[in-house]
């Protein structure tokens, strides 16, 4: 089955930080795996069709907010059989991006989410969700859905978040509001 190209999808992944280079504001992370997400959707890493195209404009966004400036760029994208690894260089000129980088460096944030256009998908009737066998990457995003929602509360209370826009966004976010 071929899914319509005009329907961008988002697939969140709890993520795993593999390496942080504070001097370069660089984070190496697993941004997706073949494990099913909460809706039962699966991304096949080898199905990424446009890696070269994406790397010509390798934007990394905050929570898929296309109307905001990117918080960084992808310097390297590595496809393995069961996962996708990205090296994200956060913007040093943006206080917002600096705060997001600090949250990853301190282990407060670990989540990532890819925004993509499905090209070929197979529904999984028994399990729900779909297997995306071919897809085009639009962007990936740093997302504030850590495994422990209390981490956001601690980050704000400890003064680790300095950017006013990020503080405001977290304070207004539905999930954050539940723990603040």
Across the structure, where does each feature detected by a protein language model lie?
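Signature of dsDNA virion morphogenesis modules
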Residues: 1-169, 179-180
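Noncatalytic, helix-rich "gating/capping" subdomain that lines the substrate-entry/channel surface
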Residues: 170-174
């Amino acid at each position: 089955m071929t899914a319509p190209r005009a329907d961008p999808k988002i697939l969140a992944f709890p993520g795993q930080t593999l390496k942080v280079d504070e001097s370069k504001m660089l984070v190496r992370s697993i941004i997706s795996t073949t494990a099913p997400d909460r809706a039962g959707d699966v991304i096949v890493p080898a199905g990424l069709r446009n890696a070269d195209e994406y790397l010509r404009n390798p934007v990394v966004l905050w929570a898929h907010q296309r109307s905001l400036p990117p918080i960084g760029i992808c310097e390297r994208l590595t496809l393995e059989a069961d996962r996708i690894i990205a090296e994200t260089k956060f913007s040093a000129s943006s206080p917002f991006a600096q705060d997001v980088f600090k949250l990853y460096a301190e282990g407060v944030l670990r989540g990532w989410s890819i925004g993509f256009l499905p090209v070929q998908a197979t529904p999984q009737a028994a399990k729900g969700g779909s297997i995306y066998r071919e897809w085009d990457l639009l962007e990936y995003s740093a997302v504030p859905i850590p495994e422990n929602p209390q981490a956001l509360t601690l980050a704000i209370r400890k003064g680790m978040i300095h950017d006013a826009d990020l503080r405001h966004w977290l304070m207004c976010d539905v999930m954050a509001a539940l723990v603040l």
